[in-house]
Amino acid sequence: MIENLKKRFPVFEKNKNLVFFDTAASALKVDSMIKAVNECYSYEYANIHRGIYELSSNLTKRYEDSRLTVSKFINSSSFENIIFTKSATEGINLVSSCLSDNYFNDGDEVLLTSLEHHANLIPWHLVSKKLKSSQLK
């Protein structure tokens, strides 16, 4: 099963014994994703949500359709609940900022483990400083 899965990742063609643990920073890409991105960049790339011309309209529709696909995949109540970010770090910064602005109150506590990645510690540390007498535990 693993060998069949590895066949979908071109990197293993030249690196047969590679064990890759850096996925949080940059995930390996499957061949179908590489092909789709290459085709998009080559034949239909445009700014999404920025133009009324055909390329932009078409790509905007595909982008929004992907939001619906993800929504269905994770059984979300609405595609509007799906937000794309460029990284997990950007995502956790967005979540911590939105929660601190809209849901947290002075004195609230944020609980974290000692195993958190630095990119998850800093946003919550900033939240605790922003809210008077809040604690990061």
What are these regions (language model features)?
Residues 1-137:
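Pyridoxal 5′-phosphate
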